[in-house]
Amino acid sequence: MTAAVVPLVAEHDSWITVDPILGCPADCAYCYLGPLGLRAARPAVRATPEMVVAAVEDYLCGRRAGVIDPATDQTPLCVGNYTDMVLTRPNREALVRIVALLAERIPRRPLVVVTKGRLDPDLLAAVDGHGFPIYWFLSQSLGRHAGLPLERGPIADLDTTLDNARLVSRTAHQKAVHFWRPFVAELRQSRAELETLVGRLATADMACSVVVGLTRGPGVPTREERLVTLLPESMAAPAGQWEVFDEEGWTDARATALAAGYPLYRNTSCALAFLGGEPEALGTWRQPYNAHRCLPAACPLVQRGRCAVAAAGEWTDAATLAARVAAYLGLGAGQVSVTAGELVIGDMIDEFDYNTLLHGYGRHLAIRAQGVRRQKAWLGSFTEGGLAA
């Protein structure tokens, strides 16, 4: 994948991404922007806010509307997956304008912004008045805290991340999530440090944390010198391991979070469900994902109850759905079937189309295909390079 082919609007794993700006002034060793030439780069605007929102409208009401009703769809929109919308003034100004225009033009749905920047009250106030839920994923690896210079540039340290969460908690429509990545052995906290950290996260009104390992594979900077030097154990993992994750550290972090009553998740989709008070949308609670990404999470019982309701549901209009999906994918009617809790596609499928079907039906059905063609720079936990039927 190259920067030239990054779509303006695309269906990622947990959300629809909207990317009017490419390039991030931060320089994080593990970031997928590195191989794209977009790391430690001046952000380049390729679409005005007006163009962006028109593209979102076209996307939601175009081909996608054949399988998901844009009037009721609650798939979040994430603004800025190939930049940081907070790290420069023009980016912040664009974000404010995009939020305002979205509120004018599309039905209410959650918005997501992933950032390592410092939030300020004026920015939060500017985006809060439109009534859209806004979820700030505050990315904090704790690398600086551990003395490992994995990140360079104008990014938040732990204290600033916690201050950001406090500011967000004072708004009417916004919530903060700690995006804990990469979660690897070299950054492992002691049990005492974890107890202190979880306590600080909770008292800062962080809604929850999402713990993500070091992703590897196509589009990921595995030859980055800092990764090889600072994370030698993680980089020495077997070549076929698409995510390097500190299981021992996770055991301690999970136990600490459970003891403190602090939600700790392995999937962003679980955090989004918790924030919205809804069942998880992609089926993380379904096999084969539940053993590693659902059951081990420090998830409140009330949220597990919401997902249990979704798990018990059945799809009743199989023929209509199969025909709808076949038309969406341009396949013959006999190549799509709905049976025994599964939507089965008898062909390869593009990753963005697979994600669209997950967003529309993953809460109700397992989505199976002959394989998934990767379309972005990193692998998702559901596709993992190609989910076989």
Enumerate the language-model features and the residues they cover.
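Generic preference for hydrophobic/aromatic residues in regular secondary structure cores
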Residues: 1, 6-8, 12, 209, ...
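C-terminal accessory extensions appended to soluble enzyme cores
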Residues: 7, 219, 223-389
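Alpha-helix capping and helix-coil boundary motifs
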Residues: 48, 190-193, 317
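Conserved AdoMet/S-adenosylmethionine-binding subsite of the radical SAM
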Residues: 53-62, 66-234, 240, 249
